[in-house]
Curated annotation (Swiss-Prot):
EC number: 2.7.4.25
Any single GO BP term: pyrimidine nucleotide metabolic process
Full protein name: Cytidylate kinase
InterPro entries named in the record: Cytidylate_kin, Cytidylate_kinase_dom, P-loop_NTPase
UniProt keywords, alphabetically: ATP-binding, Cytoplasm, Kinase, Nucleotide-binding, Transferase
Residues annotated to bind ATP: G12, P13, S14, G15, A16, G17, K18, G19, T20
Species this protein is from: Shewanella loihica (strain ATCC BAA-1088 / PV-4)
Gene: cmk
Length: 230
């Protein structure tokens, strides 16, 4: 697979800090940003809207092939996600959508249908690709790969805080159970399991600040892409 622009992949489980770090790096470098998890959330939401069963692989793959989705970068304000002309940035962050996204992502035909869309985001001047298999499947030849992780307890707490801030009514114990269940499902699925790429820098974000993680990431990027001016 040829690459038209430099790519930095950032993989890891939910709540490890991928989204925050990816947005900071994209802003710092002036690069495009791909939130791969959002694509699966959008597909899950589209399935719900169109009454497609989450265990119907064929129908989900067909829906994915014709998915009308746009990602609009808003400087300093994250990413605006648009599905069929509607801003769904808030809707796709619900816990229901999060769990549904993990389920639809387990189907090989669904992943294949969305693979081309993800790779199309690789454009100049560069791309920060945030996901779960960016470095292992989608952009395996990228020289700069990161894998962020954190304890299940800390990731559940981060998710709890995030959902509370957005006005969702959530239970921390239930969230922790869902984090553990999702980890088990994602790490043991037969297609594109959640594992670090062999050449990825693994960063455990438990108990460390955002600035420190960003500096570790930038140092790795500079090492792997020495021609970049950071």
């Amino acid at each position: 697979m040829s690459q038209r622009a430099p790519i930095v992949t950032i993989d890891g489980p939910s709540g490890a800090g991928k989204g925050t770090i990816s947005q900071i790096l994209a802003s710092r470098l002036g690069w495009k940003l791909l939130d791969s998890g959002a694509i699966y959330r959008v597909l899950a939401l589209a399935a719900i809207h169109h009454n497609v069963e989450l265990d119907n692989e064929a129908s989900l793959a067909l829906l994915a092939a014709h998915l009308d989705v746009q990602f609009i970068t808003a400087n300093g304000n994250g990413i605006k996600v648009v599905l069929e002309g509607e801003d769904v940035s808030h809707a796709i962050r619900s816990q229901e959508c999060s769990n549904a996204a993990s389920k639809v992502a387990a189907f090989p035909r669904v992943r294949e249908a969305l693979l081309r869309r993800q790779r199309a985001f690789a454009e100049a001047p560069g791309l920060i690709a945030d996901g779960r298999d960016m470095g292992t499947v989608v952009f395996p030849t990228s020289p700069a790969k990161l894998y962020l992780t954190a304890s299940a307890e800390e990731r559940a707490q981060r998710r709890y805080n995030q959902l509370q801030d957005k006005g969702f009514d959530v239970n921390i114990d239930r969230l922790l159970a869902e984090v553990v269940e999702r980890d088990e499902r994602d790490m043991n699925r037969p297609v594109a399991p959640l594992v670090p790429a062999e050449d990825a820098l693994v960063i455990d974000t438990t108990g460390i600040g955002i600035d420190e993680v960003v500096e570790l990431a930038l140092s790795h990027i500079k090492e792997k892409l020495p021609d970049l001016v950071l």
